[in-house]
A protein has these predicted regions:
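Short loop/edge segments at beta-strand edges and connector loops
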Residues: 37, 134, 169
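Conserved radical SAM core fold
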Residues: 64-70, 107, 198-204
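N-terminal small/glycine-rich loop or linker at the start of catalytic domains
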Residues: 1-9, 59-72
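Histidine-acidic metal/acid-base catalytic patches
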Residues: 1-29, 41, 52, 87-98, ...
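Conserved beta-strand positions in the central sheet of alpha/beta enzyme cores
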Residues: 34, 60-62, 101, 133, ...
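Glycine-rich, proline-tolerant flexible connector loops at the mouths of alpha/beta enzymes
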Residues: 32-54, 104-108, 141, 201
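Active-site acidic/histidine proton-transfer and metal-coordination neighborhood
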Residues: 52-53, 72-166, 256
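Short, flexible active-site-adjacent loop segments at beta-strand->alpha-helix junctions, enriched
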Residues: 11, 39, 62-67, 106-108, ...
Length: 258
């Protein structure tokens, strides 16, 4: 059983310039990368050259986050949302991203905002060839965010019914809002496009606290998940000093080879 980990540059080595974070991810044996919205602000030629040189794949990136953490569900802002979605699709496909995360934004959860989000997601799907991800975000982390629970995300996906629309299953957020990770994964497995991990209590390194990832991650694999595990956590100190949490899983890999 092999575990591949994706370095989230929005959190790991955040104190360093963006391209330096990528180099350190390679140096510290990450299999792939995932971005927030950094590619919107840098030279894409330099980025593509570095990704090619380091032979790192890219799981995904975000649309512009802005002050409202996206705006795709905010009524009255669809022109802005669709302009930013189109720009992000162009960038994501140019740099070889597997997926684009469309943030809904901070707005009330009601039928008008639901319809707005659905319309803008349909626009994204029509104008792209890559995976489109939506992510439930817990109230504690981001008060007022439109999409909070995995059931809400699943309802949106059911309404649109498109094979390239999936859920970003962030274990930190799912645990806070919906509880039992494995139960929720099983219930929505066919709708999950990417998994992210962090400690439950403080969003630090994934092997601290109540979530036993040494058990949970192998279970995700046994239940059919084949993707990388996104490391979107807040390091408790220098990023490289806290990477030993991966060691028990690497040991599991070696045990299965014997």
């Amino acid at each position: 059983m092999k575990f591949n980990f994706s370095a989230n540059t929005g959190y790991l080595w955040r104190e360093l310039p963006f391209l330096e974070r990528i180099k350190l991810a390679k140096r510290h044996h990450f299999n792939s990368l995932e971005f927030h919205d950094e590619p919107h602000e840098i030279n894409l030629t330099d980025l593509k050259k570095l990704l090619y040189q380091l032979e790192l794949s890219l799981n995904g990136m975000n649309v512009r986050m802005g002050d409202t953490f996206g705006c795709a569900a905010i009524p009255g802002r669809s022109d802005q949302a669709q302009s930013e979605i189109k720009q992000a699709i162009t960038i994501a496909e140019d740099i070889g991203a597997r997926a684009l995360h469309i943030l809904s934004g901070v707005t009330e959860y009601n039928q008008t905002s639901i319809n707005t989000f659905i319309s803008n997601l349909e626009f994204a799907l029509k104008n792209s060839k890559i995976l489109i991800l939506i992510e439930p975000v817990c109230e504690e982390q981001l008060p007022g965010y439109f999409l909070k629970t995995i059931d809400q995300a699943a309802d949106i996906i059911n309404c649109i019914n498109h094979p390239r629309l999936k859920i970003m299953f962030d274990c930190y957020h799912i645990d806070k809002e919906s509880g039992d990770l494995l139960k929720n994964f099983k219930a929505h497995a066919n709708k999950i496009g990417h998994i992210q991990i962090a400690a439950a209590e403080n969003r630090a390194e994934p092997f601290e606290g109540k979530l036993n990832y040494r058990y949970i991650l192998p279970e995700f694999k046994r239940l059919g998940y084949q993707g990388d595990f996104g490391c979107e956590y807040r390091p408790s100190g220098p990023t490289e000093d806290g990477l030993s949490w991966r060691d028990p899983l690497f040991e599991m890999e070696n045990e299965t080879k014997i």
